[in-house]
Amino acid sequence: MSSEVKQLIVVAEGTAALGPYWQTIVSDYLEKIIRSFCGSELNGERNPVSTVELSLVIFNSHGSYCACLVQRSGWTRDVDIFLHWLSSIQFGGGGFNEVATAEGLAEALMMFSPPSGQAQPSNDLKRHCILITASNPHILPTPVYRPRLQNVERNENGDAQAESRLSDAETVASYFAKCSVSLSVVCPKQLPTIRALYNAGKPNQQSADLSIDTAKNTFYLVLISENFVEACAALSHSATNLPQTQSPVKVDRATVAPSIPVTGQPPAPVSSANGPIQNRQPVSVGPVPTATVKVEPSTVTSMAPVPSFPHIPAVARPATQAIPSIQTSSASPVSQDMVSNAENAPDIKPVVVSGMTPPLRTGPPGGANVNLLNNLSQVRQVMSSAALAGAASSVGQSAVAMHMSNMISTGMATSLPPSQTVFSTGQQGITSMAGSGALMGSAQTGQSPGPNNAFSPQTTSNVASNLGVSQPMQGMNQGSHSGAMMQGGISMNQNMMSGLGQGNVSSGTGGMMPTPGVGQQAQSGIQQLGGSNSSAPNMQLSQPSSGAMQTSQSKYVKVWEGNLSGQRQGQPVLITRLEGYRSASASDSLAANWPPTMQIVRLISQDHMNNKQYVGKADFLVFRAMSQHGFLGQLQDKKLCAVIQLPSQTLLLSVSDKACRLIGMLFPGDMVVFKPQIPNQQQQQQQQLHQQQQQQQQIQQQQQQQQHLQQQQMPQLQQQQQQHQQQQQQQHQLSQLQHHQQQQQQQQQQQQQHQLTQLQHHHQQQQQASPLNQMQQQTSPLNQMQQQTSPLNQMQQQQQPQQMVMGGQAFAQAPGRSQQGGGGGQPNMPGAGFMG
């Protein structure tokens, strides 16, 4: 038998828009398809004669954002090498425009070997192509090469036209059916343009699409060609084989840890409520990034019976808080583990299925992170109770897939009010209550004819996935319980987050927007979680801050929903759709006049939002991007913020560390005024000047106080000055009196001397002319004069000590002297009477 050559080309988008979803796509879809395609394990048989060739094509976007438009690899037959190529793709670039999907598909068509002349059966094609993209294709036709066909159009000379032609992506996709190549698509978003590409590449437009397992990734668009038998078998083998009338539980998942060699000891097997569990190999799983998921209830009735799920492994948790082992079957690789993606956390679609009795088993969920952005100061609060996302309840003859309605949502309201969300099957009900009290250790036990295993509380509150629970979650740590009380026999299904001990849960990269009006969130009285990223289903919650549940209204209110657009070459380009939330304390008319589309006018550095001081009041808002875009990643990488001019406000928009989360600062008016930033030296100088001014003010105050004191002391000073002036006047009068007395004394002495000289001269004449008697008579006046001079000498002697005393005691003796001076006459001499 001749060897058959089978070819598979993976055409992947290389921009940053696909980067967050790539690991999920590789682990959940591509790896399964490739291994099934290379092994050909159809119906348990292996076909050794087939030869497999694998290749990779990477396309980017038009413009200057990407260095290369299309890249291709060679052909390889080694599966591991090809998987290594897939895991080594570096995503980056992109922009506002669409991607070059047409060029990538055309390159893949040209790489395939030309079709042989013999027509191949449509259900047994050997050449396949898988398109992986997260962006819309370029809408304008571009020059691409297309392969030659037997019935191609010919020119005037009759030669086949194989030159470059203008074609869009849908036109190129239509050539796949003509070239006997199956076209399948995997898109992490529900894009209508990608579905149109798949429909254009279908050989039979009337054929119905096959049901593909999208339970893990709710919003993923996975369309596998019916002619790609190996891919359909690989994905249907891991699916639940549910009827088309039943919607599987939809959980958006992302990055999955690669398989790791078997290590550690397997935990003790746990008996199931519906039968024993087969022996499975314990597998240790590496750290996985996690995130929270929104729960939205829905009800489906009248479901047909379904077979059991032997491929979904059970989860057992050891009593210790170390990283546990996960039991999984050998037929299901570890990459099938369900983990949450922090960057894309859409709705969980729970269903209520009646009329089914087969045993249900759960797959090993990843660690759950409940990271809630409650306010703009980045205060993170999380639920302080168990968050169950996917438990199944066996009630009589029905199996109920139950989801806790108290999970933190992504910003969309639930279908029922929080206090009225009820899951019912007609016989038993599982009621989600917005309770206001602490979870009690016991509750009403539902009447269930099925097997009920007592749920015994443990110190670590271990919950096995396959335990039949007849009591509502005993053994929880004391604290706020934001979950629902479950009644009836419950068999835990997918994504059970157990382990309510004293531990921590890793705070991953994604936080969920609080849903307005949902009371079960219990945003008050709960603490932040922190811990280790683990793919184990253990969820250890920190001790709550209060012993009773506290219900509170949401701190954010949705005020706006619209489009965010930019400009490219003067034309507006849609970036993403936004939802705006304001604080509950902000004004109701904050976004009253906002337009449906916000236009970015320019980009500025993010430092303006973090380090600047603004004049006036700024309101903070939180925005949620409905879809991820490469432009938002560039804003975060380059630390830029967008300036949006609103009718009467200015909005500065920056991307936060959380996926699809944007922070806005809203300013009134059409411009933002910054306070000038002053360098340190100038600040020091200003401080010095301020100190100097303070010192001057203190000095002025002191001077004012002194002046005030002086004003108070002025009367005393004036009195002292008057007294001093009086003293000076008295001293002056005394000096004048002394001078006058001296003059009088001198005059008297001169007169006396003159009289003496006259008397002496007259006496001499008398001696010469008269006898001795006359001379004696004449001497008597002389004696009399001498006697008169003696009192005068006495007065001079008395005045000298008085002048000395007056130098120090002039004030005391001044009145007496003034009376003496006021007499004006000669002093009374005690010797005057003696002369008479």
Curated annotation (Swiss-Prot):
Function (record text):
Component of the Mediator complex, a coactivator involved in the regulated transcription of nearly all RNA polymerase II-dependent genes. Mediator functions as a bridge to convey information from gene-specific regulatory proteins to the basal RNA polymerase II transcription machinery. Mediator is recruited to promoters by direct interactions with regulatory proteins and serves as a scaffold for the assembly of a functional preinitiation complex with RNA polymerase II and the general transcription factors. Positive regulator of shade avoidance and of jasmonate signaling.
InterPro entries from the UniProt entry: Mediator_Med25_VWA
Describe what happens without this gene: Late-flowering phenotype when grown under long-day conditions. Increased drought tolerance and sensitivity to necrotrophic pathogens. Increased resistance to hemibiotrophic fungal pathogen F.oxysporum.
Principal localization? nucleus
The molecular function terms of the Gene Ontology recorded here are: DNA binding; transcription coactivator activity
* Localization per record: Nucleus
Name under which the protein is recorded:
Mediator of RNA polymerase II transcription subunit 25
Q: Which gene encodes it?
A: MED25
**Secretion signal span:** none
Q: Which GO terms describe its biological process?
A: defense response to fungus; flower development; jasmonic acid mediated signaling pathway; positive regulation of defense response; positive regulation of DNA-templated transcription; positive regulation of flower development; red, far-red light phototransduction; regulation of flower development
